[in-house]
Amino acid sequence: MTKALLKDLNARDAPLREQLEQEATSLPKIVLSERQFCDVELILNGGFSPLDGFMNQKDYLNVVENLRLSTGEVFPIPITLDLNESQADSLKAGDRVALLDPRDGQTVIAILTVEDKYTPDKANEAEKVFGANDRAHPAVDYLFGRAGNVYVGGKLQAVTPIRHFDFVEYRYSPAQLRSDFQRNNWNRVVAFQTRNPMHRAHRELTVRAAKQHGARVLIHPVVGMTKPGDIDHFTRVRVYEAILQRYPKGSAKLSLLPLAMRMAGPREALWHAIIRKNYGASHFIIGRDHAGPGKNSQGEDFYGPYDAQYLVEQYAQEIGITIVPFQMMTYLPDEDIYKPVDKVEPGTRTLNISGTELRRRLRVGANIPEWFSYPEVVAILRQSYPPKYSQGFVLAVPATSDKLLPSALVSALNEDGRRHVTLLPRLDAISVFYAQELQRAGAAVVVSLADADASVKVPAEWTTVNIKPKDSVSEVTFAVLSQLSDEGYL
């Protein structure tokens, strides 16, 4: 299987860096959004090859309608520089614009040469790319709620290499990963995409796929933008580090992908396959509901469970990667093994723990069995997501005629003895900061809203104590302790 042509703009433009840096000082500047920043990184390092810039209108329309660039190459997701009208008004074809790193708003990471600007039909984009014009889809919500109304197309030149400061040892570019595979004679590599922690089922699935195809495993998780509510990438990477030790020595490698996901189901799966081909993989695992965003506004799945497999198989030979389709893995307790559900005989006893149930067990501190996940993985998840009784909380006490109520709550909680409690006597910007830091550290905090700074709002995640006009201090205190106990904080 031939290697995909890699457009590594970082390598191409390295000799021009000093000249481009000097030019950028006099150019108009745009601070990228988080998603644009992820897109630029993968354009510059070749992860989005054959792209070498943001799509012009011709490419955009062809991708939306036909899953191809205007030159014919398969590419299923529009990669566009969306701007608001005030940003785009002054731009015209031929202009040069410096694109800035959003983390500091100063570092020039690329220069864009404007080719065109155009107003997209967002409703059509939503229907064609994401399958529905439904704000319950996170990418559709982004499209209408956050993305600018003008798209600017044009080619990029790399200026300052993008630096990351976490898990640097796993941040390989496509060229670096290809070189590593070649150096270690990894001629067959099966890539595994994930935005979630990995458990035993994922390990069994990837090992099985590698054995079937005589390949090594590339664990290639997304650490850019994922689905809102996903577990943070810091926790996930620690999990991947731990589970990597459970693979046969020399059979698996971890590399992080700075991708901004769109959760576009079948189209996204095809996009992921192209990206993995660019990173040097020969095979790509596509499982059940690949890159699905969950339920639509009618409570139904946006995509069928295996739609992604069907679509990618149609293009696999053309893009040059072998698809490894897998159904969900399930545990057979009587045999102590995992099998794909389609390989399980009718009537066989099986066990599984859903993501919802896992989150519940973490929340209440319930047992997570070893058949489901490795102890070291569970320990990492519990550290990042402790049960309610180990989490901090903040009680905001409204002004009342009895100014002793905040002190009474502190005394009652301290008497209970299960939590460390701090009283902050006034709401202002400084006390909000202290309360949030104490909460993060697992402490209980009581904040009096008497004499509150009117310019400071009570954070939404705080619990405001409900006080009825005739309630006594003891009645309020009892009600608060009962509520905290019912919610699992005590």
UniProtKB/Swiss-Prot annotation:
Coiled coil: none
Domain notes: The oligomerization domain is distantly related to APS kinases, but it is not functional and does not bind APS. It is required for oligomerization of the enzyme, although the oligomerization state has no effect on the catalytic activity of the enzyme.
Phosphothreonine PTM sites in chain numbering: 356
Species per Swiss-Prot/TrEMBL record: Schizosaccharomyces pombe (strain 972 / ATCC 24843)
UniProt name for this protein: Sulfate adenylyltransferase
Catalytic function, reaction form: sulfate + ATP + H(+) = adenosine 5'-phosphosulfate + diphosphate
Residues reported in the UniProt entry to bind ATP: 193-196, 287-290, 329
Region Catalytic, annotated ranges: 166-390
Gene name of the encoded protein: sua1
Subunit structure: Homohexamer. Dimer of trimers.
Residues binding sulfate: 193, 195, 291
CDD domains noted in UniProt: ATPS (cd00517)
EC number: 2.7.7.4
